[in-house]
Structure formats: structure tokens, C-alpha cells
Amino acid sequence: MEKKTANDVVTLARAQDRLTTLEYIEAIFEDFLEFHGDRYFADDLAVVGGVATLQGKPVTVVGIQKGRNLPENIERNFGSPNPEGYRKALRLMKQAEKFNRPVITFVNTAGAYCGIGAEERGEGEAIAQNLLEMSDLKVPIISVIIGEGGSGGALALAVADEVWMLEHTIYAVLSPEGFASILWKDGSRAKEAAELMKITATELKELAIVDKVIPEVMNGQPLEQAKINRMLQKAFISKLTELAKLDTETLLEKRYQRFRKY
């Protein structure tokens, strides 16, 4: 199979048939109980989360939810969270800390919502607060990019002990279209921009920005989704078992150094 270009990966990352956060939760975890609302303003349906079990042990799972079709995407705001979505995520993560549950996040967003209402309600502050709190959260955190990882809207759920990416996903400070518009004043050069930006899982693993790439193709053939789900489940169990052996001080120091090295 011919090697995929960065633009090919962008297309695959945005594909509407990619599994959503809720579908991964259903496939990997048991006993999921969804929580709603940020306790300040509203329940942002672009962010989902709650408590589940993994191999019989409680975990908190949080993720950004896109829709499968136009009505679902309208309901989920096309996976672009408002500030109340990030505040809901933080509420669940602080609850996880209180009850000593590890946190697993799933990221798939083009970026945080940039509407007037979102800005008025403190979109930037909500993202910044998540970065601050996650950096010092006293339980293990694993973040997985399952589609698009766009800008601060993605990073707000990805300050983790380990960040993983599925093979055909992207993680970037902005979209290739945005990059081309800013650099060349020509959004039509997005394909060219994608090749320069180093946004694919393979490139980011080489740069040590991400810690693990979950394969979606093996021996030139697409892997069955069920096999990808099993790989993720086993990897979660293995890594959480490893992180659970660390005392809190060591866990936080390693997390700090992980981001400090950039």
C-alpha cells in the first residue's frame, strides 16, 4: 500500500465514519454512567464524560463527541466545545482526583467553539484552567487523539501522563487551512501546509510529542475496528497498572518534565 501523505491523513482524521468517543467508551469499558452539566451554566453536548469500569476497576472517562450526521453534529456543535464543556470535563476530573480514579480522555475536535457567547462566558479561561488543573491532577491521566486534535481546544483535554494517537489522526496548533491562510494568505494551499506542519501521528511520535501510536493498518490492510478497540483496552490496562505504582510526587514530576522538555 502506498504511503499516505499528510493530507491523506487529514482526510482520514476528519472522516465521518470514525468511531466517536461514546462508541469507544461502549467498546472498551463497562458500566458507563454519564454525568451532565458544568454546575455553572449548561450541559455542553460536545463533551461527554462519566464513570466506568476497566477490568473491574473504576475510571473516569471524558471526551469530545462529534456527530455521525448533520442533525447529530448540530446537537454536538460539530465537536467544538463551549466553555461549559471544558468546565464539565474539569468537574469530572476533579471528582476523579477526590475518589482516586484514573482519568482517560478521548480527543476529536477541530478546536474550541469561537462564537461570541463562548467568548463572553470565558472560553479562554476555561481552557487555561483545564491546563493548570490537569498539570497538577493527582491521579494518572491518559489522553488519546481519535480524530482531529485541534489547537487549545484539544490540549485542554490532553495534559496527560501519556498522549497517544491513532495512526490516521492529527494533532496541531491549527488546521492546515488556517496555517495556509495565515502564512500565505491562501487557504487553498492547505495540502501544501499539511506536509510542512508535522501533524501526523508518525511525525509527532518521532518528535516525542506523543508517546504511542495505535496502528489502524497492518501489512497493508485496514485493521478491524474490534481489534483496534482491544489494543486500546489492553494498552490502557497495562499503562494504568504501571502508573498506579508511582507515588503522587513522582507521577506529577514525570508529567511536569514531559511537557517541560518541549
From Swiss-Prot:
Which parts of the sequence belong to the CoA carboxyltransferase C-terminal domain?
1-242
The yes or no answer to whether the keyword Lipid biosynthesis is present is: yes
Q: Give the main localization category.
A: cytoplasm
> Which keywords does this chain's UniProt record carry?
ATP-binding, Cytoplasm, Fatty acid biosynthesis, Fatty acid metabolism, Lipid biosynthesis, Lipid metabolism, Nucleotide-binding, Transferase
Please give a single GO biological process term from the UniProt record. fatty acid biosynthetic process
Name the Pfam families for this protein.
ACCA (PF03255)
Pathway as given in its UniProt record: Lipid metabolism; malonyl-CoA biosynthesis; malonyl-CoA from acetyl-CoA: step 1/1
Q: Which HAMAP family match?
A: AcetylCoA_CT_alpha
What is the protein name for this chain? Acetyl-coenzyme A carboxylase carboxyl transferase subunit alpha
Taxonomic path: Bacteria, Bacillati, Bacillota, Bacilli, Lactobacillales
